[in-house]
C-alpha cells in the first residue's frame, strides 16, 4: 500500500488518480486533448482505474459529470473500490443540487470547479 493521509474518517493514498485525461483536458494543446478523448473510452477508463488500484492507489479525483459517474458506477459494480473525490461540472447550473447528487452518488469529497468560483467572484455574485 502506498503512503496515506487522513481524509475525514478515511485514509487516502497521497498519490491519487487524476481524471483530466479521461475527459480530454490536457492543459497542453487541443491536439492532445482530442487524442485523450478518442483514447479514453469507458472500458479504457475502467482499465486505467483498475491498474491504478492494483498498484496501491485508492482514490480518483475527477469531474462529477455523467460520463465519469457512469464509469465509476460500472467500476464499483465490477468490484472496484477506489474512493471518489468529485469536482463539480461547471456546465451544470444547479450547484447545490449537483453537490447533493454527488454526495448521494458516493463522493467522499466534493469541490467547486475553479472556473465557476472565478466567474462568480468576478461578477460579484459569489455566495
Where are the regions a protein language model picked out?
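N-terminal binding-site loop/beta-alpha segment at the start of enzyme catalytic domains
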Residues: 1-78
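A cross-domain feature marking catalytic cores of carbohydrate-active enzymes
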Residues: 19-21, 62-64, 86-90, 112-114
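Active-site mouth loops of central-metabolism enzymes
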Residues: 27-43, 84-94, 117-124
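Generic hydrophobic alpha-helical segments
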Residues: 48, 98-99
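Generic structural signal for hydrophobic
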Residues: 51-52, 101-104
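Positively charged, amphipathic N-terminal segments that serve as targeting/anchoring signals
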Residues: 54, 109-110, 115-116, 125
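Active-site-adjacent beta->alpha loops and helix N-cap segments on the catalytic face
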Residues: 64-80, 91-98, 116-127
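Glycine-enriched alpha-helix->loop->beta-strand junction motifs that scaffold or abut catalytic
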Residues: 77-81, 103-109
Amino acid at each position: 500500500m502506498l503512503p496515506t493521509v487522513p481524509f475525514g474518517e478515511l485514509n487516502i493514498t497521497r498519490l491519487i488518480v487524476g481524471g483530466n485525461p479521461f475527459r480530454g483536458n490536457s492543459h497542453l494543446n487541443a491536439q492532445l486533448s482530442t487524442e485523450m478523448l478518442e483514447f479514453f473510452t469507458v472500458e479504457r477508463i475502467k482499465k486505467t482505474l483498475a491498474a491504478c488500484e492494483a498498484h496501491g492507489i485508492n482514490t480518483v479525483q475527477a469531474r462529477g459529470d455523467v460520463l465519469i459517474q457512469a464509469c465509476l458506477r460500472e467500476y464499483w459494480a465490477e468490484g472496484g473500490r477506489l474512493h471518489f473525490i468529485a469536482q463539480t461540472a461547471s456546465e451544470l447550473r444547479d450547484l447545490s443540487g449537483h453537490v447533493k447528487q454527488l454526495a448521494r452518488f458516493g463522493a467522499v469529497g466534493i469541490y467547486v470547479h475553479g472556473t465557476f468560483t472565478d466567474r462568480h467572484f468576478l461578477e460579484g455574485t459569489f455566495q
